[in-house]
Amino acid sequence: MAEHIELKRVVMVKAIVTEAFKENLIKELDRAVKNIEMQASQMDMQSKNYLEDLKKKGLMQKAAAFKHQLDDERTRQAAAKSDLMMKIEEAKRLEIGTEFVQGPLEGPVKVGIGDNLYKKVGGAEIIVKDGIVQEIRGAE
């Protein structure tokens, strides 16, 4: 019978907000907005030619279905861009010294007989400041 087993657990990464962190976060979000805009522009150019080609061939139903798909994709891209713009505004309002949740990572944890499973697998956090680990919380 095994005495230990290694499991995966979620470790939350939080960043201490600094000016450099805010600048990098805003640049990253802005880059994502520009990427969406570029994709939308390319999609518009390519789809215009494709739609004209379908209409020339008399494939009106196919053109209508494609236009519907195109409209759905434009709506999705507009929503994604709007979401990113809101995140940029939120990033600008972040206060220096506060903690910002960057997201989860998976990490291994060794669990043995007699361990409290809930303490071992739950609630671990890594606190970073400008990419440097400052603190590890809840790692039993």
Placement of each model-derived feature along the sequence:
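Short, charge-rich amphipathic alpha-helices with coiled-coil/heptad character
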Residues: 1-26
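Amphipathic alpha-helical coiled-coil segments
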Residues: 22, 29-36, 40-43, 70, ...
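Extended alpha-helical coiled-coil "stalk/arm" regions
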Residues: 36-62
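Long, charge-rich amphipathic alpha-helical coiled-coil "stalk/tentacle" segments
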Residues: 52, 56-86
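Coiled-coil termination/hinge junctions
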Residues: 74-124
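Hydrophobic alpha-helical segments used as single-pass signal-anchor/transmembrane membrane anchors
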Residues: 127-128
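Short clusters of small/polar residues that mark proteolytic maturation junctions
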Residues: 137-138
